[in-house]
């Protein structure tokens, strides 16, 4: 059997039902998991609570910055900080979960990339409508 498949099967066999359900959830909104004080990011208790209670499979809207998220250049994650911050949240989840399973980062780009420093384009469905030549 493939070593990767063996590893996955071993991991799944160690998981509780609650942990398996947690891997399927996107219950925590990434933009609500951290605070920023100048150049220092700290995780809010919400992240650890969610991780301990249910587990986390997906962190969505981590980089989102718009009026709805209340994230701005003073409070959000800037372009140059993205990679380091995503690595930081991955490390936090791995270090603070029983089996050390990393999370899937969902950037919610179906609405256009709503992140600081991103180029904004219309949503894919709107862009598709522009190619009707008749």
Feature map (PLM): residue ranges:
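N-terminal beta-rich core of secreted/periplasmic extracellular enzymes
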Residues: 1-134
């Amino acid at each position: 059997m493939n070593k990767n498949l063996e590893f996955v099967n071993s991991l799944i066999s160690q998981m509780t039902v609650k942990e398996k359900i947690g891997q399927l959830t996107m219950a925590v909104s990434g933009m609500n998991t951290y605070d920023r004080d100048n150049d220092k990011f700290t995780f809010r208790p919400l992240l650890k609570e969610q991780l301990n209670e249910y587990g986390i499979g997906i962190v969505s809207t981590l980089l989102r910055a718009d009026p709805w998220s209340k994230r701005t250049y003073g409070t959000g994650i800037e372009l140059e900080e993205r990679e380091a911050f995503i690595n930081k949240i991955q490390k936090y989840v791995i270090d603070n979960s029983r089996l050390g399973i990393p999370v899937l980062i969902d950037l919610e780009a179906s609405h256009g990339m709503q992140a600081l420093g991103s180029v904004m384009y219309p949503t894919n469905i709107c862009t598709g409508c522009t190619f009707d030549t008749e």
